[in-house]
Amino acid sequence: MFSFDALLQAIARQTVLCVGDLMLDEFVYGEVSRISPEAPAPVIAVQRSETNIGGAGNVARNIAAIGARCIFVGLIGDDATGRFLESELGSESRIEPVLVCDGSRPTTRKVRFVSEHFSTHMLRADWETASPAAADIEQRLLDAILPQLARADIVLLSDYAKGVLTARVIRDTIDAAKKLGKRVIVDPKSANFAIYRGATLLTPNRKEFTAATRSAAATDDEIAAAAQDAMALAECEAMLVTKSEHGMTLVPRGGEPIHVPALPVKVRDVSGAGDTVAAVLAVVLASGANWATAMRAASAAAAVAVSKNGTAVVTPAELRRRILPHASLAAEEKIIGSDEELDERLKQWRREGLRVGFTNGCFDILHPGHVKVLTAARGACDRLIVGLNSDASVRRLKGESRPVQHERARAEVLAALEAVDLVAIFEEDTPLRLITRIEPSVLVKGGDYTREQVVGHEIVAAKGGDVLLVDVLPGFSTTSLVARAREGQS
């Protein structure tokens, strides 16, 4: 039986040696509303910016974020960008950076200009030298890599074709790892898979796979056939082809392919998703899992990564919710116990760029009218918070005979619904304090209210949010249901 907790415990004992092209990823977010008078070029009104460790460094960050240790070997230039990356990697408790400085080249830096509203990339500017490292730098890289192999449980080569993974570095690293019985995973960039000869697993995306195999790779059967030929040439044990929204196909050498569909998710940014896949594959395989388990974990991690803005990492809690989607339906996870806990959830969602919705009510006896409102509310946002009147609040509003069910029971019923992400119980007569704290992007109520009657509408409108009124279902209300029950009517 699969145990996610046991897997996490095993992951925490693993050390991954990651070698590859380090870079700095910068994201400048803004909007374009006019053309420059100086040239036919859009003017970006910058609203904010983010800086992240990218490339193979993002692989290392994902390895560490999921709970394993990472020894990272990469190349930097003698510049401010390189020194910044060295400092940032050094501050990560689970990453041990071993960086080689090459004063003849700049540290790779990529700046992306992104539409804040649409999450679309408008422009990218690169600072880089992509030529292979010189012979003396190659030797320094190998001097950094080879002594670390004995400490590693698995080796991961992250090739961005920026000069670190030369043919010699690849060859000597794989040969030395094999002598020590270490498995090697390669996220390839070269169209010549033969240079990765002897690796355990190659993880190309569909475009890279098509270029390397000169096959159409239009169907899973075509991918499987071409992969067998490529594996014979590269002498590797398996090939995993990532296919974006079409999922992944893993082909073991001489075995039956395994196909995993992509998990449904709102894609915000695909930057670094391949890094996440490679990192999770490495740590899960190192932990002793089989191909299928590692592949499904990687697919779940990719779904989390692409739902975030920028170059992102995946945490164990996020992976748990994707691998075990029903685990997050437990009442103790969805029912908020304090303002501080609510703030922490909101902080995480906003960091991921998610649209937060809010609705509220007594929900004393759940009926189809409630379900319609909750379903419509969830459809208008990424995460839905339900404000629930406490028992004392219900008594003040509905009379001493209410509620029929106490607040904990009502909260647990709401928490069991797929449409509901959080339940927050409030003591006041109205949810105004909650709405002020949450500042939702969308506020939802039943259509028996007007927009002006919805508590908190002015707060939401002031922040540029929306107020959604959902048509009520005639004949369904808790008050009428209670009255009919007391009269013995059905």
Swiss-Prot record:
Q: Annotated region Ribokinase: where?
A: 1-330
Name under which the protein is recorded:
Bifunctional protein HldE
Q: What InterPro entries does UniProt report for this protein, alphabetically?
A: Bifunc_HldE (IPR023030), Carboh/pur_kinase_PfkB_CS (IPR002173), Cyt_trans-like (IPR004821), PfkB_dom (IPR011611), RfaE_dom_I (IPR011913), RfaE_dom_II (IPR011914), Ribokinase-like (IPR029056), Rossmann-like_a/b/a_fold (IPR014729)
UniProt xrefs under HAMAP family: HldE
The record lists the catalysed reaction(s) as: D-glycero-beta-D-manno-heptose 7-phosphate + ATP = D-glycero-beta-D-manno-heptose 1,7-bisphosphate + ADP + H(+); D-glycero-beta-D-manno-heptose 1-phosphate + ATP + H(+) = ADP-D-glycero-beta-D-manno-heptose + diphosphate
Family stated for the protein in its record: In the N-terminal section; belongs to the carbohydrate kinase PfkB family.
Q: Does the keyword Transcription regulation apply?
A: no
The alphabetized list of GO BP terms reads: ADP-L-glycero-beta-D-manno-heptose biosynthetic process
EC id? 2.7.1.167, 2.7.7.70
In which pathway does this enzyme or protein participate? Nucleotide-sugar biosynthesis; ADP-L-glycero-beta-D-manno-heptose biosynthesis; ADP-L-glycero-beta-D-manno-heptose from D-glycero-beta-D-manno-heptose 7-phosphate: step 1/4; Nucleotide-sugar biosynthesis; ADP-L-glycero-beta-D-manno-heptose biosynthesis; ADP-L-glycero-beta-D-manno-heptose from D-glycero-beta-D-manno-heptose 7-phosphate: step 3/4
Recorded GO molecular functions are:
ATP binding; heptose 7-phosphate kinase activity; heptose-1-phosphate adenylyltransferase activity; phosphotransferase activity, alcohol group as acceptor
**One Gene Ontology cellular component annotation held by this UniProt entry:** cytosol
Q: What is the lineage of its organism?
A: Bacteria, Pseudomonadati, Pseudomonadota, Alphaproteobacteria, Hyphomicrobiales
Q: Which UniProt keywords apply?
A: ATP-binding, Carbohydrate metabolism, Kinase, Multifunctional enzyme, Nucleotide-binding, Nucleotidyltransferase, Transferase
Q: Where is the active site?
A: 275
Where along the chain is ATP bound?
205-208
Fill in the subunit field for this protein: Homodimer.
One Pfam family name from the record?
PfkB
Q: Which domain of life is it from?
A: Bacteria
Question: What is this protein for, i.e. what is its function?
Answer: Catalyzes the ADP transfer from ATP to D-glycero-beta-D-manno-heptose 1-phosphate, yielding ADP-D-glycero-beta-D-manno-heptose.
Organism, per UniProt? Answer: Rhodopseudomonas palustris (strain ATCC BAA-98 / CGA009)
Where is the stretch described as Cytidylyltransferase? 358-490
